[in-house]
Amino acid sequence: MSFELRVKKNTPLTGETDSKLVAETFLKLIGYLSSGEKVNSIPFRLFACFLFHPQKEWMVDELTIELKTTKATVYRHLNKIKALDILEEGKIDEGKKAKKTYKIRYGNLKKAWNFVEANVELAMNNYGETVNHLQKLVEAK
């Protein structure tokens, strides 16, 4: 799965005290939520499951029940969160076979965000190498 994040110039939301409003705005800034989605949307509520219950290991079946939606919808939005690289996968034995679980890395969004920053740094370094290579190609003509 490829890492994906929208990077946009912004002002830190440190003056806001409503955690849901901060989360909603933040998720729109990074491209997880579209501009029209609100806190009652499935994508926001899915992210909120992880954010507000960081130690809980969620199975897809549990998320389906919690969000009152289909597995396909849960997986569609779960894959967007996984693309940010902030979730860790686990397994839980349930009957005959183990089922995957998901939770915020280290049970802490701030710590999980270090993975995002590392991926951004790597991507920017790779962009820089490509720009340098392109400039050399242009100058060689």
Q: What are the language-model segments listed below?
A:
Residues 35-43, 59, 92-116:
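Short, cationic-aromatic polyanion-contact patches
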Residues 47-55:
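Short, locally clustered residues in the helix-turn-helix/winged-helix DNA-binding domain
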Residues 55-66:
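Short acidic, hydrophobic short linear motifs in intrinsically disordered regions
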Residues 82-93:
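A short, conserved structural fragment
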Residues 1-37:
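N-terminal leader segment of winged-helix/HTH proteins
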Residues 68-83:
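Short amphipathic alpha-helical interaction segments
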Residues 109-141:
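Amphipathic alpha-helical dimerization/coiled-coil segments
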